[in-house]
């Protein structure tokens, strides 16, 4: 595994792509849960050009995601901090360069659906996700962003952000 030196001087492993995070039935179930609700049960955020929500239904998948995270991040003390569904569309869709700052030490960005790929950049390297793929990285330490939204007239991208932290960071 390659390691990247962060601006802080700390070394972190390169992000990891997980193909087919969920089996096909679970993936379809998640899509069918969110697609009908996008513009009715979700808040619109014009800063990112997205509809988003953090519904309790995502907790149903926490054990599955947590098992992957513990292996990838080599830690048995991880716990979910929060999950967020985001649907991007239109000319305002964007993700500026940032690091996370809200209990997002470990991040799994899961591509639920997309009209076409919209690469995520993590520490200056592009990662292309297919539907049902995820990229795992250190959200609070690795800069990440997306370039211009492709084909804003027709493009739609659904992502779920699974954020995790260490147990002792949550309770203290």
What positions do the PLM features span?
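A short coil-to-beta-strand element that immediately follows conserved catalytic motifs
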Residues: 75-84
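Secondary-structure boundary/capping residues
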Residues: 39, 77-78, 117
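Short, solvent-exposed loop/turn elements at beta->coil junctions and helix N-caps
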Residues: 84-86, 149-150
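Non-heme Fe(II)/2-oxoglutarate
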Residues: 1-74
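Catalytic core of non-heme Fe(II) oxygenases with the double-stranded beta-helix
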Residues: 88-145, 153-160, 165-172
């Amino acid at each position: 595994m390659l390691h990247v030196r962060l601006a802080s001087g700390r070394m972190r492993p390169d992000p990891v792509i997980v193909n087919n995070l969920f089996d096909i039935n679970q993936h379809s179930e998640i899509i069918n849960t969110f697609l009908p609700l996008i513009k009715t049960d979700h808040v619109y955020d014009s800063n990112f050009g997205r509809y988003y929500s953090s519904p309790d239904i995502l907790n149903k998948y926490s054990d599955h995601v947590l098992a992957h995270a513990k292996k990838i991040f080599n830690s048995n003390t991880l716990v979910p901090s929060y999950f967020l569904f985001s649907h991007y569309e239109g000319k305002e869709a964007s993700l500026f360069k940032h690091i996370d700052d809200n209990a997002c030490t470990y991040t799994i960005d899961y591509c639920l659906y997309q009209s076409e790929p919209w690469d995520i950049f993590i520490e200056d390297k592009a990662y292309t996700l297919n539907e049902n793929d995820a990229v795992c990285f250190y959200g609070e330490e690795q800069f990440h962003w997306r370039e211009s939204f492709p084909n804003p007239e027709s493009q739609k991208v659904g992502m779920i952000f699974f954020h995790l932290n260490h147990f002792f960071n949550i309770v203290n």
